[in-house]
Amino acid sequence: ELTNRAYAVAKIAGIETCWAHNRQHGTRYIAAMPTNLYGPGDNYDLENSHVLPALIRKLHEAKESGVLKISIWGTGLAWREFLYSDDLGEACLFLLNLPKRELDSFFNDRRPPLINVGTGMELQIRDLVLKVANVVGYEGEVSWDHSRPDGTPRKLLDNSLIANLGWKAAIDLDQGIQMAYTDFLSRYES
């Protein structure tokens, strides 16, 4: 997808750099690849933020100003996975503290030292909008602007590797949205 091209290239470059250093210098770098992140300190700008923080702000402002109908980009049918940022931090600590014998399985010449970090759960954007509206308290109508893009139809990481090692996200999406909204309010109102 064109809008994510530079980001994708940067991610691939990071993975390849880790792999090359491991082979050439005997390092033991792992590239932890997260799914869509959200949480404290997020960017809630309506023009250049990711979908979840943008929805928090858009629905909050609609509620506060009494707007009865809002329009959301796309069809709402795209599927996404979300991970609370604190969970990514915990996943990285988990990986850093893996026993040597489990860590050794990551390092070979046939596979890059990459591990996906996600929840393994996805939902459609239309369901995400309902969850955010519920947390924010927006009771108006939502319409879909089909002239705007949905983006990639589905973004779900295969997180089986980290799950099989025993790691699981601690913060579910409903709880995470509530915590993100609290963060938004503390920053928005100041």
State the predicted function of each range.
Residues 12-19, 52-57, 90, 126:
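Conserved active-site helix of classical SDR/Rossmann-fold NAD(P)-dependent CH-OH oxidoreductases
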